[in-house]
A protein has these predicted regions:
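Conserved donor-binding/catalytic core segment of Leloir-type glycosyltransferases
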Residues: 4, 170-187, 193-197
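A short, well-ordered alpha-helix in the C-terminal region of glycosyltransferases
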Residues: 174, 308, 315, 322-336, ...
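Nucleotide-activated donor-binding/catalytic signature segment of Leloir-type glycosyltransferases, i.e.
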Residues: 217-241
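Carbohydrate-associated surface elements
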Residues: 127, 148
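Short hydrophobic beta-strand element within catalytic cores of glycosyltransferases
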Residues: 270, 274-282, 292
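Acidic donor-binding loop of glycosyltransferase active sites
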Residues: 247-262, 278
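A short helix/loop element that forms part of the nucleotide-sugar donor recognition site in Leloir-type
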Residues: 155-170
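Conserved acidic donor-binding segment of nucleotide-sugar-dependent glycosyltransferases
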Residues: 293-295, 299-307, 315-321
Length: 359
């Protein structure tokens, strides 16, 4: 099978979709012939990239079996291709925000017109599929395939002293909770600081690595609660420092909350943590329910239930054996279920099935 893969978000730009699309472009080549057309220059180039890539795809599509789109925003390209090549297969990955983005123009054309016109949709979680079906995308077109992770690339030989150097504090007799990724409201950091952190043992430190629109609110929550000595905001970090954090923190927390018009499509950050043998405590919400199998690669907690979070975290902090055992199970589970060598093969099977349905 010959796949023409299009990505509007791609390295060297840093981000979750960028990383996933890069991995797809590499790992799919193990099972198929793949040509990638990618925007490598960030959002500023998207207005030029869309007409450019549409024209290129229209000229190239005769030589390929499947047009594979890296996210739902590219559905307009797929729609145009289907008009010109009705017997060619077009499939798109869909993340949560591809369906829930609160813009009437986008909802009218992309969600109600362009996406349903495609031959297949690969949703990154069951919650994303449920949302797609609610949005009237035919259920038979939607396949659920989780995001993948290359476990070996994240794992490293880091020591606690490396973490102390990065954070600039002594960690003797201290526990480190970690959250990484874009600081959006749905991630729940503000809620966690206000409702959970101050109820945890005083020797518990909360580290956030990432940037985003919620930063000011997080700083305000730190000030209001008087927890400045227990919260460290690192901002955006390098891949090296992210890996260091993931390999040395005690517990990874993802305390997501419900936010109208937004959702966690999958939750790749928790899978990156489990790949590094970190126990995870996360909200039993949206795509996190797909990423985490309770008591296998983490613990799922009722969203916005502060006492449930306190109980789960305190138990793990005070029981070294249980914490380490959960981390070991998490790593094994992740390598079995989420390694890219497994996920990429599932993508190829889904693309082959979509191609057969068109013929």
């Amino acid at each position: 099978m010959k796949i023409l893969f299009v990505s509007r978000a791609y390295p060297p730009v840093i981000g979750g979709i960028e990383n996933q699309n890069y991995a797809l472009s590499i790992w799919l080549q193990r099972y198929a012939i793949v040509k990638t057309l990618a925007n490598r220059y960030g959002k500023k180039m998207i207005p030029l990239f869309f007409p450019y890539v549409t024209i290129r795809v229209l000229f190239m599509m005769r030589s390929f079996d499947v047009l594979f789109l890296g996210d739902g925003v590219l559905a307009i390209v797929g729609f145009i291709v289907k008009l010109c090549y009705p017997h060619k297969t077009v499939v798109s990955v869909v993340h949560g925000l591809d369906l829930t983005y609160r813009n009437n123009f986008y909802q009218t054309f992309w969600v109600r017109c362009f996406l349903p016109s495609l031959d297949g949709i690969i949703a990154v979680s069951q919650e994303t599929k449920n949302t797609a079906v609610i949005k009237k995308i035919p259920e038979e077109k939607v396949t659920v395939i989780a995001n993948g992770v290359e476990t070996e690339a994240l794992q490293g030989h880091y020591e606690r002293k490396d973490l102390e150097k990065l954070l600039g504090v002594s960690l003797e007799d201290r526990y480190v909770l970690l959250t990484t990724g874009r600081l959006a409201k749905r991630k729940g950091a503000v809620w966690f600081i206000r409702n959970v952190l101050q109820k945890l043992p005083n020797n518990t430190l909360y580290v956030l690595a990432g940037a985003g629109p919620e930063e000011e609110n997080i700083y305000a929550a730190i000030k209001e609660t008087g927890l400045a000595a227990r919260v460290i905001m690192l901002g955006r970090v390098s891949d090296h420092d992210r890996d260091l954090l993931l390999n040395t923190a005690d517990i990874f927390v993802q305390p997501n909350i419900r936010v109208p018009g937004d959702m966690e499509g999958f939750g790749i950050a928790v899978i990156e943590a489990t790949a590094c043998q970190r126990p995870v405590v996360a909200s039993n919400l949206e795509g996190l329910k797909d990423a985490i199998c309770h008591n296998e690669n983490g613990i799922l907690v009722t969203p916005e239930d502060s006492q449930a979070f306190v109980t789960a975290l305190t138990r793990l902090l005070h029981d070294n054996h249980e914490r380490l055992a959960l981390g070991e199970r998490a790593k094994a589970y992740t390598e079995t279920h989420y390694h890219w060598k497994v996920i990429a093969r599932r993508y190829v099977v889904a693309l082959e099935a979509a191609a057969k349905s068109v013929k």
